[in-house]
């Protein structure tokens, strides 16, 4: 390990065009699940100046008013909704339905998912991820609660943290791009963001005189949202997960029901990793899962603790396979993935919402007991 190094992560606000598309897709999913807990949903959203397109596949008894959902979601994000909304949702392929449905649910597709946890923060996430997402969450709060006047819904943040011997030591650089009114004084905006956002977000990692704080480094940021940038679901994968600091299998999360292992597998992998670290079985843990379409059990479950584990990785892998059910049915049941709450967790990282089932550390004692039983079996 290098003595000193810098790790960086970014986040975006709920009003960012890509994130707003994710929120629309998850609101469509939630609307289906409210009426039909067994709904099969794969919803994608493309939005640009003047037009929002909702497309994908459904198999459900629900009849959501998709256009109304789109318009309300855009308004809730802080924009006017003067858009033509086009809906192109069709029935799920019978081939996929046949592969997934059965006595035991099969995976909705093949794929690789990763989950991660580490000791660095209370959230058991890397410090740059936590700080970047706190900033974007506070940007939205400051706008909605009118703590800062003259700012818009669109925004981004990026945080670089300097580490010393594996420990977060100080904040090296903070970048914030915040949409604002044309007459907003830039010096006033900087002072408000430093006082009401940065100071509150970064209270537990040191900011010093050498910390670089860049506010709207491109200059003006008046035009935002879909009028400035085209938005698309699934284009903020690193923001949704671990900020690019952990491997990613490439599958997006939003707009997908629990049979889609891109989503359920990513949540379960995080759940397992967090419980391993919370149980004191490792300082750092990456969980990788792999699935084949139509098959219930994963084709691979692997644990990597970067040699920080109390037990070796093969031992921990065997333990988690005894404790956790990695089938789609098991993951949906354990993580409440047939409940309509997905729009609540799709902003500011899917793993920074303490109310989510996959963020609970309720398997720590079971993991410790299972490891002890495995030890006894081997002696």
Language-model features: where?
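N-terminal, positively charged regions that mediate nucleic acid binding
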Residues: 1-40, 47, 367-374
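Glycine-rich anion/phosphate-binding loop at the beta-strand->alpha-helix junction
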Residues: 184-277
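Glycine-rich, mobile lid/loop segments that gate access to catalytic sites or pores
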Residues: 8, 50, 68, 72-75, ...
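Short, charge-patterned binding micro-sites
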Residues: 42-60, 293-297
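Conserved phosphate/anionic-ligand binding catalytic regions in large, soluble enzymes, centered on
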Residues: 12, 16-21, 105-121, 222-246, ...
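A short glycine-rich, hydrophobically flanked beta-strand micro-motif that places a catalytic Asp/Glu
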Residues: 41-43, 155-161, 211-215, 281-292
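Internal helix-turn-beta structural module
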Residues: 48, 284, 291-379
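Alpha-helical support elements that line or immediately flank enzyme active sites
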Residues: 10, 14-33, 121-137, 257-280
């Amino acid at each position: 390990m290098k003595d000193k190094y810098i790790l960086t992560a970014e986040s975006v606000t709920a009003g960012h065009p890509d994130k707003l598309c994710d929120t629309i897709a998850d609101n469509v999913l939630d609307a289906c699940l409210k009426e039909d807990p067994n709904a099969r949903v794969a919803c994608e959203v493309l939005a640009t100046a003047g037009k929002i397109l909702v497309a994908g596949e459904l198999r459900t008894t629900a009849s959501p008013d998709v256009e109304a959902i789109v318009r309300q979601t855009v308004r809730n994000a802080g924009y006017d909704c003067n858009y033509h909304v086009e809906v192109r949702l069709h029935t799920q392929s019978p081939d996929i339905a046949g592969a997934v449905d059965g006595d035991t649910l099969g995976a909705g597709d093949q794929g690789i998912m990763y989950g991660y946890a580490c000791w660095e923060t209370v959230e058991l996430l890397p410090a740059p991820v936590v700080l970047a997402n706190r900033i974007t969450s506070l940007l939205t709060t400051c706008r909605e609660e009118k703590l800062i006047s003259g700012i818009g819904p669109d925004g981004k943040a990026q945080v670089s943290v300097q580490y010393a011997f594996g420990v977060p030591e100080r904040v090296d650089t903070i970048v914030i791009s915040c949409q604002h009114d044309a007459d907003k004084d830039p010096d006033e905006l900087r002072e408000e963001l430093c006082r009401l956002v940065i100071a509150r977000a970064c209270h537990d990692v040191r900011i010093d005189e050498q910390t670089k704080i860049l506010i709207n480094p491109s200059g003006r940021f008046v035009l935002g949202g879909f009028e400035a940038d085209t938005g698309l679901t699934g284009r903020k994968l690193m923001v949704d997960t671990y900020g690019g600091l952990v491997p990613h299998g490439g599958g997006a999360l939003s707009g997908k029901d629990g049979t889609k292992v891109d989503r359920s597998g990513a949540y379960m992998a995080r759940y397992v990793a967090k419980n391993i670290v919370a149980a004191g079985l490792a300082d750092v843990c990456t969980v990788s899962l792999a699935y084949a379409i139509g098959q219930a059990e994963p084709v691979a479950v692997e644990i990597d603790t970067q040699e920080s584990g109390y037990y070796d990785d093969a031992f921990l892998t065997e333990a988690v396979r005894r404790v956790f059910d990695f089938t789609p049915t098991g993951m949906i049941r354990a993580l409440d993935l047939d409940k309509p709450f997905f729009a609540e967790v799709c902003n500011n990282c899917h793993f920074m919402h303490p109310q989510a089932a996959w963020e609970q550390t309720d398997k720590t004692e079971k993991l410790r007991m299972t490891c002890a039983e495995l030890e006894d079996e081997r002696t």
